[in-house]
Design a protein with these regions (language model features):
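Short amphipathic alpha-helices and their capping/turn segments at secondary-structure boundaries
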Residues: 1, 26-36
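Auxiliary Fe-S-binding modules of radical SAM enzymes
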Residues: 33-151
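Surface-exposed amphipathic alpha-helices with a cationic face
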Residues: 1-4, 78
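Short amphipathic alpha-helical segment that frequently serves as the phosphate-/nucleotide-binding helix
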Residues: 25-26, 71
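Conserved strand-turn element in the central/C-terminal portion of the radical SAM core barrel
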Residues: 3-24, 43-49, 56-64
Length: 151
């Protein structure tokens, strides 16, 4: 920051697994708020074959998040992000969507998109909808910086 050199940060959603999902989101946001990146690129955790993480999952030490649960983590992360002039991008949403925008200006729109995606998969009480109750996602670009999702 002192040198005036902007930098990009890559974060990994899902890294805390089910047990630490909320803590991971809040602590990641806290770190990002302190370091003031110019761009945040969110990726989804990928478990590679033969890695120590795969072994931890096999032993039940880590329970990975599914793609819909990662949306809960991303929502909590965005709710706790308080950065200025920072571009946020997640190209891994539900393995097929991109949520992106400038912070803080685009924060509400990105949260709205995530809320709409969550509503397709979860009931208001947080329970998962049955597959035949889940909505379909269609795309419509509202601006050059990111898609909107319509139900």
């Amino acid at each position: 920051d002192e040198a005036g050199i902007g930098y990009y940060v890559t974060i990994i959603l899902g890294l805390g697994g089910k047990n630490y999902r909320n803590l991971h989101a809040i602590e990641t946001a806290r770190l990002l708020n302190r370091i003031h990146p110019r761009c945040i690129w969110a990726l989804k955790l990928k478990v590679w074959e033969g890695t120590p993480l795969e072994k931890m999952i096999e032993r039940g030490e880590v329970v990975p998040l599914d793609k819909e649960e990662i949306l809960f983590e991303e929502r909590l992360l965005l709710q706790n992000l308080h950065v200025e002039d920072c571009f946020f991008m997640d190209t891994t949403v539900l393995d097929r969507l991109t949520v992106q925008g400038w912070l803080p200006e685009g924060k509400d729109q990105m949260l709205s998109i995530i809320e709409r995606l969550l509503a397709l998969h979860f009931n208001p009480d947080g329970s998962r909808k049955k597959p035949d109750e889940q909505g379909q996602v269609s795309f419509k670009f509202l601006s050059p910086i990111g898609p909107s999702v319509n139900q």
